[in-house]
């Protein structure tokens, strides 16, 4: 079972990026019932707006999120959908 919570993802992102204007973390695991969703961990969606992302390409914004969550992902994130924008 995954040790990851929405609170853990949110606090990790806030600590790493600091200047977050909007953040929504949603557990979507229930949409992926069955072996793929249950066995490997949890499915998450992160919607984030951050000053540091202003002017960055979509790929660079996603990299910021992945870099911030590098210590959390192995704890049970199977899939991560990211909607990221600058402010």
Model regions and ranges:
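N-terminal, polar/charged subdomain of small-to-medium soluble alpha/beta proteins
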Residues: 1-87
